[in-house]
A protein has these predicted regions:
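Lipid deacylating catalytic domains
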Residues: 1-376
Length: 376
């Protein structure tokens, strides 16, 4: 591919790239292909299959191996990671890195021109500490199946919604989290899949249960160690997409309407938002002036310590140049948003992020990669 480009899309924590038709980057892939054609750019886009919850070095090794196996002899390489996939991208091309792989780091790194991170917890997320607990792990298993179910069928069954009730009301205090009910609902959701799909989902969760090294590494304390030992590679451009969701409250609850499914997913969002907002003030990263200006321009003010996208604190996300700052939740930005007819929302957050915002975001990413920036 003389003068062309290889783009690698790296999924985040619990990325379900190996569940057949459930494509993690489905809408991103379609948009980037169309955008590259519109710009007259030759680009090949690759999906990276990482272990959903393995350690960062293990996941980064898989990124490295995928690039080495598919980049051919020519063409610039660009690595784009969503959520913890952005950390995989950084680590895979870091200066002086040693990874559990036989792939030649320097051979790959010489071709890398760009690393872009999207809603990535560069300074950790308090949610990782919660999900690393025994209760948190059981809830995470249920929430992951919830996500897969909603993306597959469009909404939760009313029988499940009815049982959720106040399950998430005091989630942040570990009070009222009924483990038996979670397991029952997990089984009920799983039973709705076809036998073939159910087998794929069960294999996925069995793989997850064998290796959950990633969670402790995504805590604010874990990322402090990561950043101290992971150096950006000279000559590589680093850009980031930053997200901030609407803080939940009375207005957002009313906006969710009377639909039981929307109210249930909004209750979950409220609980996740509260947990993700608990970054200790001493661990809120100071932003370089250019990053701070970009966030103020996008949001009207500099997001505080509690601002987040339902999973990752907003102030944890900038790394390098801020390419785009969106009012969106954590999965909105990869196309799982509330917008008919082709998109399915993950949670009812009231972010207002729609197909137009999605296309503007990824047009900015494509512009950064191909050096064809949009006018503000």
């Amino acid at each position: 591919m003389p003068g062309g480009h290889h783009l690698y899309l790296v999924p985040g924590f619990f990325g379900f790239t190996n569940l057949g038709a459930l494509r993690y980057f489905a809408h991103v892939l379609d948009f980037l292909r169309a955008r590259s054609r519109a710009l007259g750019v030759r680009a090949e886009i690759h999906m990276v299959r990482t272990h959903p919850t393995a350690s960062l070095p293990q996941r980064a090794a898989r990124v490295l191996e995928t690039v080495a196996e598919t980049m051919g002899r020519e063409g610039a390489v660009h690595v784009i990671g969503h959520s913890s996939g952005g950390l995989d991208a950084r680590l895979a091309v870091a200066s002086g890195v040693s990874l559990p792989s036989d792939a030649n780091v320097e051979r790959v790194a010489r071709r890398v021109r760009t690393v872009i991170t999207v809603a990535t917890p560069h300074h950790g997320t308090p949610l990782a500490s919660f999900f690393a607990s025994l209760l948190g792990q059981r809830l995470l298993r249920f929430l992951s199946l919830w996500t897969v179910y909603v993306l597959r069928f469009g909404r939760l069954p009313i029988s499940v919604v009815a049982k959720l009730g106040g399950l998430f009301a005091r989630l942040d205090d570990h009070v009222g989290l009924n483990i038996a009910l979670l397991d029952q609902l997990f089984g009920q959701l799983l039973a709705d899949f076809s036998p073939t799909r159910r087998g794929a989902v069960e294999t996925f969760f069995a793989e997850v249960s064998r290796d959950q090294a990633l969670l402790p590494q995504l805590t604010p304390e874990g990322m402090e160690v990561f950043n101290a030992t992971t150096r950006d590679r000279p000559g590589v451009r680093y850009g980031s997409v930053v997200t901030r969701a609407r803080p939940p409250g009375v207005r957002s609850t009313l906006a969710a309407g009377l639909d039981p499914s929307a109210q249930a997913t909004h209750a979950l969002y409220q609980a996740l938002y509260r947990l993700a907002s608990r970054t200790p003030r001493g661990r809120v990263p100071a932003l370089p002036p250019a990053q701070a200006r970009r966030l103020r321009r996008a949001y009207g003010n500099l997001p505080g310590p509690g601002a987040n996208d339902g999973i990752v604190p907003t102030r944890s996300q900038p790394w390098g140049e801020v390419i785009h700052a969106a009012q969106a939740d954590h999965l909105d930005v990869i196309g799982h948003l509330h917008d008919p007819p082709r998109h399915t929302d993950w949670l009812t957050t009231g972010s207002g992020f729609d197909a137009e915002h999605f296309e503007a975001l990824w047009a900015d990413v494509a512009g950064y990669v191909f050096r064809r920036r949009r006018r503000p």
